[in-house]
C-alpha cells in the first residue's frame, strides 16, 4: 500500500482508502436495500418547469415502478439481451434503468442528439435486441430515424416508443426476475467522442454501484440530501453517480428534463436542493444567470464538478456565494466514471488546483507513456487506474480493449497529470492534446487556466497545429463573456505576464461556442479540423 503521507521524490503511486469495503451487489439489490432503509423517503422528483406538474415517488413506489418496468422488458426480451434507450431525461428513464437492472438486461445508453447514422452504429455495434425511443426530440423525428435504421440491423427485434411506455407498464403481468450477479454487465456506455468515433464501454453492476457509493462518501452525502441533476441520463454522471449515489444514501433525485440555468436555480430554491453535480460550463451559466443573488440558495452546500477542466477562477466565483463548497473529480466512462475526487473539507493547501486523491479501493499511478515506467512525483505522465469500477472492456473490440487495459488490469486513461507529495493529481490535459513546440512540451491546461482568469473570457481551448519551423504552434480559441470585448493583442500581453514566452499563443480565433460532447468536454479534434480546413 502507498501511504497518504508519501514524501516528495517517491514514485507517483497512490491508493485510495482500503478499509472501505467493496459491496458485492447488483443495482437491483441496491434498490431493494434503499427501500428497506427509507421506504417512505422521497426518492425521485420529475422536475417539470411548471411546479404544479411535478410528480414525486417514494423509494417504495420507485421499486414498484422499476419492477413493473422489469416485467415489461421481460415480456419482450431475455435476461442478457441488450436494449438501447434513446431518450432525453425523464422519470421513465430512471424506471427503465432500474427495471433493466432487475431484469438482468444490459442497457445501452444512447445520446438523443445522435444522427440517424450515429444511432445505427450504436445499435449495430452493441447488437441491441431492442430500442426504446423518445418520439420527437428538439424538433427531430426520432421514430423515423429508428424506422430508417431497422432494415440494416438484423439483431434489432423490437422498437418501443416512450409514449407507449406507461401503458405497457400498467398492463405488465408479474414475471419471475432472474438472479443478477455483481459482475454482470449492467450498461454499455458509448464514450463521449473527444477523439473521434465512440466505443462501447461494458460497465458492471458492481462497478456502477460502488463508484457512485464511493463518490457519495467523498462528498459527504447523507440521507435527506436533495440532488438536483442537470446531467444527461445517458451519461455515467447522470445515471450512475447521481441516480445510484442518491439511491444508496437515502437522497432525493430531482430530475429536470434538460439543463436550464434559470430552472436549476428555481429548483435549488423551491426543492431546497443541497447537491449539484455538473460540468464547469453548467455552473458558469448558473452563476451568470440574472437574479441569482435574489434567490434563496441557503440549502445549496455542494457543487461537484467534473467532465472538463475546472478553472480556479470558477471555484472562487462559486464559493463567493456563501456556504457553497466546490468539489472536483476526475474520471472517464471506462471507470464508471470517477477515479479521484476532492472532499468538502479537503486539507490540501491548493486543493482547487487538483482533482483530488483516489477514491476508496482505487489505485492510481502516473507513468511515462513511452516506457510504461512510473514517474517520480511532480513529473507529468499518463494517469492509470485500477479498481473494481473499471470496465470489463470495449464491446466487441478486443484491440481497443488491449490498448486501454493492460495485462495487470490497469486502465490507461490517455489523460496527463502530475501527482504531488500528498497523492493528489493535477491534470495537464489529454495525452493526444500535448503540444511539442521546438522540442518543448506544452500542456494546454496551463494556458487555458491563465486565459480563463481574464475578466472578458468565458471559455477557452488551446490546440497545437503543424508548423514547418517549430513542429507545432499554439492556437487559442476564445469565447467572450456577454457584453465584454478584448483583442488578441491584449490577450497575448496578458499571457506574457504569467507564462513563459514559448507558451504564449500567437494564433487566435474568437468563437461564439465550442463543439462539445454531451458531457461538456470540448472536442479539440473538431477545432483542429476547423482551423486546418479539413472535414
Q: What are these model-predicted stretches?
A:
Residues 209-226, 234-275, 289:
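Conserved AMP-binding/adenylation subdomain of ANL enzymes
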Residues 55-60, 186-210:
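Conserved AMP-binding A3 loop
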Residues 23, 43-98, 115-120, 167, ...:
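Conserved AMP-binding/adenylate-forming core of the ANL superfamily
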Residues 248, 273-278, 287-350, 363:
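Gly/Ser/Thr-rich phosphate-binding loop
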Residues 114-121, 131-133, 276, 387, ...:
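AMP-binding/adenylate-forming catalytic core of the ANL superfamily
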Residues 75, 105-167, 482-484:
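Structural core segment of the AMP-binding/adenylate-forming
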Amino acid at each position: 500500500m502507498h501511504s497518504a503521507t508519501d514524501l516528495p521524490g517517491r514514485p507517483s503511486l497512490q491508493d485510495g482508502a482500503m478499509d472501505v469495503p467493496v459491496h458485492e451487489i447488483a443495482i437491483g439489490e441496491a434498490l431493494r436495500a434503499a427501500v428497506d432503509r427509507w421506504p417512505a423517503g422521497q426518492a425521485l422528483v420529475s422536475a417539470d418547469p411548471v411546479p404544479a406538474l411535478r410528480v414525486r415517488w417514494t423509494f417504495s413506489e420507485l421499486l414498484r415502478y422499476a419492477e413493473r418496468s422489469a416485467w415489461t422488458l421481460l415480456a419482450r426480451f431475455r435476461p442478457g439481451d441488450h436494449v438501447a434507450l434513446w431518450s432525453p431525461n425523464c422519470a421513465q428513464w430512471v424506471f427503465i434503468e432500474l427495471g433493466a437492472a432487475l431484469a438482468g438486461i444490459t442497457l445501452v445508453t444512447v445520446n438523443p442528439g445522435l444522427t440517424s447514422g450515429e444511432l445505427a452504429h450504436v445499435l449495430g455495434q452493441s447488437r441491441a435486441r431492442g430500442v426504446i425511443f423518445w418520439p420527437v426530440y428538439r424538433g427531430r423525428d426520432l421514430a423515423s430515424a429508428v424506422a430508417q435504421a431497422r432494415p440494416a440491423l438484423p439483431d434489432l427485434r423490437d422498437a418501443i416508443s416512450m409514449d407507449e411506455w406507461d401503458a405497457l407498464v400498467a398492463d405488465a403481468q408479474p414475471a419471475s426476475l432472474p438472479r443478477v450477479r455483481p459482475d454482470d454487465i449492467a450498461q454499455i456506455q458509448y464514450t463521449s467522442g473527444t477523439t473521434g468515433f465512440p466505443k462501447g464501454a461494458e460497465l458492471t453492476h458492481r462497478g456502477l454501484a460502488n463508484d457512485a457509493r464511493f463518490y457519495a462518501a467523498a462528498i459527504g452525502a447523507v440521507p435527506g440530501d436533495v440532488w438536483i441533476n442537470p446531467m444527461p441520463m445517458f451519461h455515467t454522471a447522470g445515471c450512475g453517480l447521481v441516480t445510484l449515489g442518491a439511491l444508496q444514501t437515502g437522497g432525493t433525485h430531482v430530475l429536470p428534463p434538460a439543463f436550464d440555468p434559470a430552472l436549476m436555480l428555481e429548483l435549488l430554491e423551491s426543492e431546497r436542493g443541497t447537491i449539484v453535480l455538473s460540468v464547469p460550463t453548467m455552473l458558469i451559466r448558473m452563476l451568470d444567470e440574472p437574479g441569482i443573488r435574489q434567490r434563496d440558495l441557503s440549502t445549496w452546500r455542494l457543487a461537484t464538478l467534473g467532465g472538463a477542466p475546472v478553472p480556479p477562477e470558477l471555484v472562487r466565483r462559486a464559493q463567493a456565494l456563501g456556504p457553497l463548497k466546490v468539489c472536483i473529480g476526475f474520471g472517464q466512462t471506462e471507470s464508471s466514471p470517477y477515479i479521484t475526487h476532492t472532499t468538502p473539507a479537503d486539507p490540501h493547501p491548493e486543493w482547487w488546483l487538483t482533482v483530488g486523491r483516489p477514491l476508496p479501493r482505487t489505485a492510481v499511478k502516473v507513468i511515462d507513456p513511452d516506457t510504461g515506467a512510473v514517474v517520480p512525483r511532480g513529473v507529468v505522465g499518463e494517469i492509470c487506474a485500477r479498481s473494481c469500477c473499471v470496465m470489463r472492456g470495449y464491446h466487441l473490440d478486443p484491440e481497443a480493449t488491449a490498448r486501454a487495459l493492460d495485462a495487470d488490469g490497469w486502465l490507461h486513461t490517455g489523460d496527463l497529470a502530475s501527482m504531488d507529495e500528498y497523492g493528489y493529481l493535477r491534470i495537464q490535459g489529454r495525452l493526444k492534446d500535448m503540444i511539442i513546440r521546438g522540442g518543448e512540451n506544452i500542456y494546454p491546461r496551463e494556458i487555458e487556466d491563465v486565459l480563463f482568469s481574464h475578466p472578458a473570457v468565458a471559455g477557452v481551448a488551446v490546440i497545437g497545429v503543424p508548423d514547418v519551423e517549430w513542429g507545432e504552434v499554439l492556437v487559442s480559441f476564445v469565447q467572450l463573456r456577454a457584453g465584454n470585448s478584448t483583442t488578441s493583442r491584449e490577450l497575448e500581453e496578458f499571457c506574457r505576464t504569467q507564462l513563459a514566452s514559448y507558451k504564449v499563443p500567437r494564433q487566435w480565433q474568437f468563437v461564439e461556442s465550442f463543439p462539445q460532447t454531451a458531457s461538456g468536454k470540448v472536442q479539440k479534434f473538431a477545432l483542429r479540423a476547423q482551423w486546418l480546413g479539413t472535414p
